[in-house]
Amino acid sequence: MLFIELLKAIFFGVIEGVTEWLPISSTGHLILVQEFIRLHQDKAFMEMFNIVIQLGAIIAVIVIYFERLNPFQPGKSPQQIRLTWQLWLKVAIACIPSIIIAVPLDDWFDVHFNHMLPIAIALIVYGIAFLWIEKRNQTLEPRVVKLSRMSYKTAFFIGCFQVLSIIPGTSRSGATILGAIILGASRTVAADFTFFLAIPTMFGYSGLKALKFFIDGNHLTLSQLLVLLVASLTAFAVSLYVIKLLTDYVKKHDFTVFGRYRIVLGSLLIVYSVFKSLF
């Protein structure tokens, strides 16, 4: 039984590692996959699992961008050190809206929107938004082509877009990338800032979910700990590849394909949801 559970954990880790960085909603995909492939765990663990598994993906960002994000990296010039600290300040400013709005409302949105139909609608709505933005941008040049040129005000408003991802199916990366592009950032800058913003956001969110799990009187069994570790390690390994793939992709392509994918998947989920309610 444990062997089968660990195989499922690997599968969920792959799903997380791929969908965390593509603008197609990792949490939404995990919830949907669990309609068909279930871990034999209680509800409290699964709610925590769906969020804490993201730590593996976040650690991949730190590994890939460690030199760029480390202000104490040997060999950096004074100007590079200053720009690194400024980047971290922008990331911190972008976290403010989530701290003020998303954290207090998280449980309410979990109760009312953590279902297939709201996920499907969110997939479609943001899919349409991606198609519209990319069509609009065909005649526009981005104003922000380097992270060092991004203002603190722009970083804050990108953080406001991140709050939208509190609705399952939205996609944290999708919301921040979409917001950054709307605010004039290039696709490369939008993707990079999304990766960096994920570090404090997801560490904090995962920490809160884990803390809530234990405060509510739950305990991790050895099998649950193994499932969580295996899934997180898999997400880490897959993320190392997907992050590099996405950074290369956005240099030559737009996000239209992801918009179309979201619309198709959301439409199929609505059909499935209706079919399931009838039968």
From Swiss-Prot:
It is found in: Cell membrane. Keywords: Antibiotic resistance, Cell membrane, Cell shape, Cell wall biogenesis/degradation, Hydrolase, Membrane, Peptidoglycan synthesis, Transmembrane, Transmembrane helix. GO terms for biological process: cell wall organization; peptidoglycan biosynthetic process; regulation of cell shape; response to antibiotic. It is a multi-pass membrane protein. InterPro entries: UppP. Its EC number is 3.6.1.27. Belongs to the UppP family. Bacitracin is thought to be involved in the inhibition of peptidoglycan synthesis by sequestering undecaprenyl diphosphate, thereby reducing the pool of lipid carrier available. It comes from the Bacteria. GO terms for cellular component: plasma membrane. PANTHER family: UNDECAPRENYL-DIPHOSPHATASE. Its main location: membrane. It is an enzyme of class 3 (hydrolase). This is Undecaprenyl-diphosphatase. Catalyzes the dephosphorylation of undecaprenyl diphosphate (UPP). Confers resistance to bacitracin. It catalyses: di-trans,octa-cis-undecaprenyl diphosphate + H2O = di-trans,octa-cis-undecaprenyl phosphate + phosphate + H(+). GO terms for molecular function: undecaprenyl-diphosphatase activity. The chain crosses the membrane at residues 2-22, 44-64, 85-105, 113-133, 163-183, 188-208, 225-245, 255-275.
